[in-house]
Every structure is written in structure tokens, then in C-alpha cells.
């Protein structure tokens, strides 16, 4: 669906996949999920299906941190732009600043004026909807501008799994994910899963004792563990079978055609 959307966007005839108006997004307060830190068990831990890059399960040490209860919105991204976010070199990683200047990046992909492109064509941009189609470079710059940071993949997964007796777990099937009856569109609402894939600051690297699976599945994951970043959480175009705490999506830092977004983190 994301490939189809990109193809429609590049078509000068204004072709649509659906002819519907976007529903208004849910507005949620920005609270924080706090985690006390300590030893967390990460990776696929059940007998169900998982790709080889989701394991082996292992332990990591976390310092105390907090994860935002909702995704960054279009309205907040407008504030970033208005404050000179795309013109302030100090906010950007060196490679990211070079990418911005070389490609004249001024806004997320599929934005123009106060509209954004969807599977149903150009529509008014909802300020309360999660911002999507941004690169890792943009996500990192926004986090710097906001005075926070991106989470690590381990922090994100620890919040998703919860902590017995202290922190509730989050339902991987509970968010806005693929529905055959409606076009994929981020709506917000505060769920950890769904709406858009969320960038982490973790490089896409093998877990301790990782061994590629035999056959075609092993060809897909291990060979791409170079120069990419991990994303968590599933999107509005993700089948629910791919939504789980251990799932590791991965993209190069300049790529934007997927439903990618931002959830902020901070140290506590």
C-alpha cells in the first residue's frame, strides 16, 4: 500500500485509490510512560512465528526513562517548520543536514501548503493527526528541537511489554492498523501500536548470539544489518500479524515513503 501511494503521488493525473474524506483525528494529551530502568528481557519470547532478527531473546540494562504517550502531530511539526527547523544546522546530524541541503527538504513527504497526499488524493492536513512520511534525519532533528530524544528500541519494547505489578502491557492488536474496508490513514488516539512506524535511535544490528535462519527468510534480514535504523510499533498499513513488541522494522535514514513517525523519549 505504501508503494501504491508513492506511485499515485508521482502520477500527474491525480489518480486516487479511494474516493473518501479523511475522518478527524483523535486529540490526545501528551503524557509520559515512565520506566524505572533495570534489567529488561528483549526479543521474541514465545512459540509463535517471528522473523530471525527478533531473537534470540536476551537481557539489556536500561537507565530510568520515559516514553511519550502519543505520537508527534502534524500541528507540532508545523511549529517546528515555523521555528526554522529545516534551516537550523545545529539541530541536525551532519549527514542529515547534508541531505536536507542537497535535496531542498522543507517538509515531510506528501505535504504541500496545508494539504497532504493520501490514498484518496490531496486532502486538508489535520493538525491533530500523527505526522508521517518523515526520515530518521527529520525525526532526530525534531527530537533535538523539542528538547528530548528518540527512544532506543529496547526502551520502546520494555514499555510495550510492561512490567508485572508496576507497568501495564500494551496490546499489539489495539491500535489503528490495516483494515480492508477503509484507506490507511493515521488517526492518533494514544495507542502505542498502530498509526505509523516509530523511529528509534537504535541501529539495525544483530542481537547477541544471532544466527540467520536457513533458506529465504534468512536472506531477508541478516544481510541488511548495515546503515539502517530500527522502527517499532506497526502502522495503519500493517497487517495485524506483523504487530508485536519484538517486531523490528528497518529503513535507511533518508527514506520516507513508509508511514513513519515520531514518539519522543526523555531521561528521568
What do these predicted ranges mean?
Residues 3, 7-51, 55, 70, ...:
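Functional-site microenvironments in short loops/helix caps that host divalent-cation chemistry
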Residues 256-268:
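Short, structured beta-strand segments at or near domain termini in extracellular proteins/domains
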Residues 57-63:
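Acyl/amide activation-and-transfer machinery of modular secondary-metabolite enzymes
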Residues 218-222, 249-256:
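Short proline/glycine-enriched turn/loop segments at secondary-structure junctions
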Amino acid at each position: 500500500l505504501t508503494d501504491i501511494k508513492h506511485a499515485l503521488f508521482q502520477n500527474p493525473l491525480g489518480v486516487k485509490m479511494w474516493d473518501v474524506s479523511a475522518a478527524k483525528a483523535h486529540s490526545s494529551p501528551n503524557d509520559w510512560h515512565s520506566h524505572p530502568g533495570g534489567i529488561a528481557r528483549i526479543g521474541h519470547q514465545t512459540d509463535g512465528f517471528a522473523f530471525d532478527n527478533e531473537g534470540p531473546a536476551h537481557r539489556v540494562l536500561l537507565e530510568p526513562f520515559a516514553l511519550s504517550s502519543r505520537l508527534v502531530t502534524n500541528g507540532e511539526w508545523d511549529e517546528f517548520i515555523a521555528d526554522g527547523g529545516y534551516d537550523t544546522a545545529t539541530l541536525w546530524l551532519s549527514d542529515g543536514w547534508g541531505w536536507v541541503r542537497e535535496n531542498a527538504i522543507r517538509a515531510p513527504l506528501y505535504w504541500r501548503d496545508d494539504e497532504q497526499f493520501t490514498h484518496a488524493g490531496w486532502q486538508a492536513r489535520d493538525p491533530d493527526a500523527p505526522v508521517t512520511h518523515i526520515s530518521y534525519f527529520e525525526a532526530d532533528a525534531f527530537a533535538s528541537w523539542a528538547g528530548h530524544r528518540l527512544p532506543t528500541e529496547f526502551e520502546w519494547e520494555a514499555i510495550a511489554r510492561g512490567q508485572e505489578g508496576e507497568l501495564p502491557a500494551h496490546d499489539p492488536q489495539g491500535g489503528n492498523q490495516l483494515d480492508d474496508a477503509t484507506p490507511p490513514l493515521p488517526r492518533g488516539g494514544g495507542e502505542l501500536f498502530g498509526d505509523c512506524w516509530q523511529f528509534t535511535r537504535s541501529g539495525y544490528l544483530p542481537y547477541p548470539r544471532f544466527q540467520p535462519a536457513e533458506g529465504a527468510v534468512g536472506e531477508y534480514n541478516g544481510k541488511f544489518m548495515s546503515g539502517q535504523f530500527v522502527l517499532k510499533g506497526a502502522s495503519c498499513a500493517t497487517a495485524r500479524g506483523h504487530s508485536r513488541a519484538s517486531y523490528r522494522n528497518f529503513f535507511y535514514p533518508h527514506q520516507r515513503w513508509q508511514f513513519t513517525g515520531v514518539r519522543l523519549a526523555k531521561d528521568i
